[in-house]
């Protein structure tokens, strides 16, 4: 593992933060458009956009976790990045709420596991996001399919890729395994189902 300076770490966090903010602005705009269409005659059924943004945060953290375990264990800098990049939702908090377990998996517990156990846990957690991913993707993908002069999926994936690229250097070196993990899990959770719902 190579060493990165605090200045480099800060620069990576700033770049990732800009990409994250762009993704959030895009999602806010899309969510408003979806709700304007869906609840035009039923304004009382509108929901807080925070729900959509929290779902995105959970999906993003899962993508980043897959990257972190792809080339070994989750480094302290990777953990910090994964926890600090999001503003609306936390994956492990969400899973504990789903389980109704106060003493479920936490970031501290995950950090104390060895690399192989971390990888196993991340693999086991992924299927538990199926419903959340569908709830996040479906309305946005349908909107994307209706708007012919803009490719919202491409814009969102561009921001996610930029965040992943920054995270890949947090342990000092960017590996092909991390890039592949980002693409594979990103396709599974976002891109593949988005394209399915756009049809």
PLM features: what roles do these ranges have?
Residues 2-69, 73-199:
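Small-residue-enriched hydrophobic alpha-helices in membranes
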């Amino acid at each position: 593992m190579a060493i990165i300076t605090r200045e480099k770490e800060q620069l990576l966090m700033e770049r990732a933060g800009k990409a994250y903010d762009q993704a959030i602005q895009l999602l806010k705009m899309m969510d408003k458009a979806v709700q304007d269409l869906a609840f035009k005659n039923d304004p009382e059924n509108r929901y807080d956009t925070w729900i959509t943004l929290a779902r995105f945060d959970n999906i993003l953290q899962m993508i980043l976790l897959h990257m972190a375990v792809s080339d070994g264990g989750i480094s302290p800098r990777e953990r910090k990045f994964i926890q600090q990049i999001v503003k609306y939702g936390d994956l492990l908090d969400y899973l504990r709420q789903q389980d109704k377990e106060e003493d479920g998996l936490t970031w501290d517990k995950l950090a104390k596991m060895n690399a192989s156990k971390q990888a196993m846990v991340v693999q086991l957690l992924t299927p538990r996001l199926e419903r959340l991913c569908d709830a996040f993707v479906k309305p946005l993908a349908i909107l994307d399919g209706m708007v012919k002069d803009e490719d919202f999926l491409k814009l969102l994936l561009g921001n996610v890729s930029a965040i992943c690229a920054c995270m890949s250097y947090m342990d000092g070196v960017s590996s092909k395994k991390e890039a592949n993990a980002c693409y594979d899990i990103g396709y599974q959770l976002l891109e593949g189902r988005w394209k399915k719902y756009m049809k």
